């Protein structure tokens, strides 16, 4: 399989993919190189798009959505790993193929994934009136999760120290851009398009309620037993052990789970173990400024 063809792109464990800008948003250079193709992607009316800022519960939501589509059939979800079941539109790793090619080869109905900010979403999704599910996570936990992810994922820039990364994240100089702009852009779009806007913290606190919401949005009718089954199979502890969902099939040269596992904590409030008092004050001040123009609010702890 393509997974094992590493010869055209060799990692020695130190090399990382380079990055560049697309319309002011930092992206891996390979993504920048095919930007026109991504922008011109042709969606189909029955496509379901899952959109998130990186590390906001993407994989979790993908599993839930697929189980809803398949009416709780767990075996169907074990047919292939996450990155093969859900084409990641703007992603390309020379040895693993590209999300675009995957999407084009996939029969309908497709469940697709993107981390693009709303203003960079290929227009065809809106023209075809596709259903889009957006998940937002509080920025403190999101930052911590993204930091650990960049440590283990060679397809993204080296995050440096936690202190350095804290500044990088606040400045929005990470791949897919500023968290603040991302969540606000999708929030502003949600009432004009078929967008279901969910929160990671709600999914944690009351998973059944949120699964029910997704089921209604996808227009499926599932009984209580199936909903409970979906909640069970998409709980953090079960998913962490699921080799088809925990990204353990990606070669270690790209994702090194010994540095930090892909499924690390899946918790709300883990940021308290990372933020110093000074960082927290600085973050809150910055947050207040950047979020002054929106009614969007987040839960930072339970």
Curated annotation (Swiss-Prot):
3'-phosphoadenylyl sulfate binds at residues 55-60, 137, 145, 200, 234-239, 262-266. GO terms for biological process: 3'-phosphoadenosine 5'-phosphosulfate metabolic process; flavonoid metabolic process. It comes from the Eukaryota. The active site is at residue 115. Expressed in liver, kidney and jejunum. Substrate binds at residues 113-115. GO terms for molecular function: aryl sulfotransferase activity; sulfotransferase activity. InterPro entries: P-loop_NTPase (IPR027417), Sulfotransferase_dom (IPR000863). Pfam families: Sulfotransfer_1. Signal peptide: none annotated. It is found in: Cytoplasm, Cytosol. It catalyses: a phenol + 3'-phosphoadenylyl sulfate = an aryl sulfate + adenosine 3',5'-bisphosphate + H(+); 17beta-estradiol + 3'-phosphoadenylyl sulfate = 17beta-estradiol 3-sulfate + adenosine 3',5'-bisphosphate + H(+); bisphenol A + 3'-phosphoadenylyl sulfate = bisphenyl A sulfate + adenosine 3',5'-bisphosphate + H(+). PANTHER family: SULFOTRANSFERASE SULT (PTHR11783). Sulfotransferase that utilizes 3'-phospho-5'-adenylyl sulfate (PAPS) as sulfonate donor to catalyze the sulfate conjugation of phenolic compounds and estrogen (E2). Can also sulfonate estrogenic compounds, however, the dietary flavonoids (phytoestrogen) and environmental estrogens, like bisphenol A are better substrates than 17beta-estradiol (E2). Belongs to the sulfotransferase 1 family. This is Sulfotransferase 1C4. It comes from Macaca fascicularis. The gene is SULT1C4.
């Amino acid at each position: 399989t393509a997974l094992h063809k590493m010869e055209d792109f060799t990692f020695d464990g130190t090399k990382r993919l380079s990055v560049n800008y697309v319309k002011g948003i930092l992206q891996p250079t390979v993504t920048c190189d095919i930007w026109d193709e991504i922008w011109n992607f042709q969606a189909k009316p029955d496509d379901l798009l899952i959109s998130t800022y990186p590390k906001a519960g993407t994989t979790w939501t993908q599993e839930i959505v697929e189980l809803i589509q398949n009416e709780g059939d767990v075996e169907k979800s074990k047919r292939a790993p996450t990155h093969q079941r859900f084409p990641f539109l703007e992603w390309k790793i020379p040895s693993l193929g590209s999300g675009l090619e995957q999407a084009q080869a996939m029969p309908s109905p497709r469940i697709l994934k993107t981390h693009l900010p709303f203003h960079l979403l290929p227009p065809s999704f809106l023209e075809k009136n596709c259903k889009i599910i957006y998940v937002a996570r509080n920025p403190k936990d999101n930052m911590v999760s993204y930091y650990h992810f960049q440590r283990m994922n060679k397809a993204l820039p080296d995050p440096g120290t936690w202190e350095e990364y804290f500044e990088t994240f606040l400045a929005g100089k990470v791949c897919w851009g500023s968290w603040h702009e991302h969540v606000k852009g999708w929030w502003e779009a949600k009432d004009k398009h078929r967008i279901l806007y969910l929160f990671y913290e709600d999914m944690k606190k009351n998973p059944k309620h949120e699964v029910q919401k997704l089921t209604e949005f996808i227009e499926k009718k599932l009984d209580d037993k199936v909903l409970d089954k979906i909640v069970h199979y998409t709980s953090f502890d079960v998913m962490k052990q699921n080799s088809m969902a925990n990204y353990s099939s990606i070669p270690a040269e790209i994702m090194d789970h010994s540095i930090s596992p892909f499924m690390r904590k899946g918790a709300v409030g883990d940021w308290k173990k990372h933020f110093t008092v000074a960082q927290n004050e600085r973050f809150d001040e910055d947050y207040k400024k950047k979020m002054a123009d929106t009614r969007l609010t987040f839960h930072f702890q339970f």
